[in-house]
Amino acid sequence: MTKSTSGDSKNTLYCSFCGKSQHEVRKLIAGPTVFICDECVELCMDIIREEHKTHLVRSRDGVPTPKDICQVLDDYVIGQSHAKKVLSVAVHNHYKRLQHGGKNNEVELAKSNILLIGPTGCGKTLLAQTLARILDVPFTMADATTLTEAGYVGEDVENIILKLLQAAEYNVERAQRGIVYIDEVDKISRKSDNPSITRDVSGEGVQQALLKIMEGTVASVPPQGGRKHPQQEFLQVDTTNILFICGGAFAGLEKIIGSRGRGTSIGFGADVRGPDERRTGEILREVEPEDLLKFGLIPEFVGRLPVLATLEDLDVDALIDILSKPKNALVKQYQRLFEMEDTRLAFSDDALKAIAEKAIARKTGARGLRSIMETILLDTMFDLPGLDAVDEVVINKEVVEGRAKPLYIYAERREDVGSSA
C-alpha cells in the first residue's frame, strides 16, 4: 500500500518497500503506482556497490583493471585523482606480475613498491586500506617511528611481517601476497648529512633494516613475536611478492623542491608564481628522487620505492565532500548512530562548510573532522538517550561556531504542524 485511507492521514504517502511514511523520510520518489524513499535508494546503491566490489575481488582469472580499482577507490576516498591513478596502475601491475610470474622466465619483472607523499590527513592510510579491501589480501600497518635496528630497544623490522602473518591467520602463502603500509617514513630520515660517531638506530639504521624485506628476502618470523621467546620455532616468509606502500607528510620537502628551481619562467605558458603562492600539494607533485635524498632518505631506500604518488591538500569543498559523500562518510555514521535512538540528524550546508573550515584552520586535514564532530555533538549525544519523542536534531552554522544549541524537533510538534496545515 502506498496511501493510507483511514482518518486524517488518508493523503499520507508511504514507501512501497520499507513502509515508512513521507514524514519519516527526507524524500519520497513517485513511480507508476509505487513510491520509494531516499533510504531505500541508498540501500539499493550499497547492494549494487558491494556486488560490484565482490565481482572485482573474485575475478581471479583476470586481475582487476586499473579503472576498476580506481572506481572502487572513488567510493571511499574523495579527490586525489592523480594518486588514485598511480596507485591503481601500480597495484594492477604488481598482482598481474604475481599471476603470470612463472609463465615467461626470460624477462623477470621487478617489484614496484610505492611511496605516498602528502600533507597530514589527506588520505594516504585510507588509500592503502581500501586497496587491500578491494583485492581481498592480508593487510597490516606499521609506524616507522617505533622501529629500531635489531639489537636495540624498540620494535624489530621483522615484527612487520609477523603482523602481516597474523592478519593472514598464519597462512604463509596468503601473507606472501599481502600489502604492508609503513606510515611516517619521513620520520626515519637521516638526522644529519655528516657521519657521526653515535649510531643512528632509529633513522638511517631503520632504513637499512627495511631494505632487505622490501626488496625480497626470506624472513625468519617468530610466531609469538620478538625477543621474549628465543627458543621458539621460526616461520619462513618470503617477502618477494609482498607489496610495500610507504607514506609520510615530508614536512619541509616543498622547500627543498622550491630551492631546486622549477626551470625557466619565461614564455607564455610559464608559471611565474612564487613558492609561497602555490599550495603544498602542487609543489610536491614536482618531487624528484634527488629531493628525497636531500631530505634524508638513503639512496638504496629511495631505489626500493620506484613509484611516487603525491597527494593534494584538501580544500573546503573536498572536506565537505568527505563529510557527506563517501559510503562510510562521517555524517552518515553519526546519522546511523542517532537512528539507533529513533532520531534523525540533519546538517545544514553552512554547518558542513563551517566544520570544513575548522579542520583547515587546525591544519589536521580529514583526520580532524571526527574530533570536531564529536565536540559539536557531545552534549546532544549525552542528553538524547534520556529525552522522549525527539524526532530530529538539526545542526547549523551557529551550532558549529558555538553560538547556539542544536535545534530539537519533537514528534508531537511536527504532528501539530502537519494537522494545522
From Swiss-Prot:
It comes from the Bacteria. One of its GO terms (molecular function) is protein dimerization activity. It holds the Pfam family zf-C4_ClpX. PROSITE patterns: CLPX_ZB (PS51902). The keyword Zinc applies. Residues 3-56 form the ClpX-type ZB domain. GO terms for biological process: cell division; proteolysis involved in protein catabolic process. One of its GO terms (cellular component) is HslUV protease complex. ATP binds at residues 119-126. Keywords: ATP-binding, Chaperone, Metal-binding, Nucleotide-binding, Zinc. Zn(2+) binds at residues 15, 18, 37, 40. Signal peptide: none annotated. The keyword Repeat does not apply. HAMAP family: ClpX. Belongs to the ClpX chaperone family. Component of the ClpX-ClpP complex. Forms a hexameric ring that, in the presence of ATP, binds to fourteen ClpP subunits assembled into a disk-like structure with a central cavity, resembling the structure of eukaryotic proteasomes. ATP-dependent specificity component of the Clp protease. It directs the protease to specific substrates. Can perform chaperone functions in the absence of ClpP. This is ATP-dependent Clp protease ATP-binding subunit ClpX.
